[in-house]
Regions:
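Short, conserved micro-motifs composed of acidic
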Residues: 1-272, 277-283
């Protein structure tokens, strides 16, 4: 299908969000999906999304026109709210209204999009082109990757541009921070490149210093554009958007991630917490 948005990281390879939601069968084949209901698709143009690993916090890019910037794109958040149990005894949920992130992240004359939440939901990476952005070799404002951190009160810090070697004179966009909290995948026009946007990976150490980015190489990168790479929580499978020979516009592709490009191994416990007080002690064994 001609989907022109980056995929959202499917934590358990069961759900992927594009412009629509698509669910995988046991054979990992996706159906045609369904449009998301309120607060999505309510008149604004919606772009990239990112979902926390507990599926409770979602960040989405959406149009937010202003008199001085009718093309303004900003970042919003929404939370998944427990709505009690339904007649079948199952918990039901709904997405709350969209909340515009503040001036620490959004800028009135800039472009903030392509969010990437950390697994803990305490770091937000995103791409932005701003009034003070430098120009690339073609005279276009450069997109850079920024990060904001949530404090103990739940407030987001002033977003800072990632330092070199992540930032460069080229275009950087479409970040994805793996649940290991260390491995960052992103798209860039930097050299060496096969052409257009290529996919890159960098890792940060205990001192919060990023390693020199590594190009994912052929056959993932081509002379066309590749971006929006996301990696499953187990680190085995990657999904990305590509405009290349044989595709119809910008399509979503997947591939098994080679060992050299994998993030650190993480263990994710998936379940539903029942707020009903237990009648006895609960023992959890890993």
């Amino acid at each position: 299908s001609n989907i022109d948005l980056k995929p959202l990281a499917p934590v358990f390879l069961s759900i992927a969000l594009f412009a629509i939601v698509e669910r995988a069968s046991s054979e990992k084949e996706f159906d045609r999906g369904e449009l998301l209901s309120y607060p999505f698709n309510e008149g604004s143009n919606f772009g990239g999304v990112s979902l926390s690993i507990d599926n409770r916090l979602l960040v989405v890019a959406a149009s937010n026109p202003t008199p001085d910037n009718p093309q303004n794109i900003d970042l919003f958040t929404t939370t998944y709210i427990v709505n009690g149990k339904n007649d079948a005894g199952d918990f039901s949920y709904y997405w709350g209204g969209l909340n515009l992130l503040g001036p620490e992240i959004n800028t009135p004359m800039g472009w903030e999009a392509q969010p990437a939440l950390s697994a803990e939901g305490d770091e937000l990476f995103f791409a932005s082109a701003r009034e003070n952005s430098t120009l690339d070799d073609d005279g276009n404002p450069t997109m850079d990757i920024y990060v904001s951190k949530k404090d103990e009160n739940g407030d987001w810090s002033h977003a800072e541009k990632l330092p070199p070697p992540i930032s460069s004179s080229a275009q950087e966009k479409a970040p994805f921070i793996h649940p290991d909290g260390k491995t960052l995948y992103f798209s860039s026009t930097r050299l060496p490149s096969g052409g257009g946007y290529d996919l890159w990976v960098s890792r940060r150490d205990s001192m919060n210093v990023w390693s020199e980015p590594v190009n994912l190489g052929m056959p993932v990168n081509t002379t066309g554009d590749e971006h929006g790479l996301v990696v499953s929580s187990n680190g085995n499978e990657a999904f990305f958007a590509s405009r290349r020979s044989g595709t119809k516009g910008l399509d979503i592709l997947s591939f098994p991630l080679p060992k050299a490009l994998k993030p650190e191994a993480v263990k994710v416990i998936h379940g539903v917490v029942d707020p009903t007080p237990p009648s006895d002690d609960i023992i959890l064994t890993l």
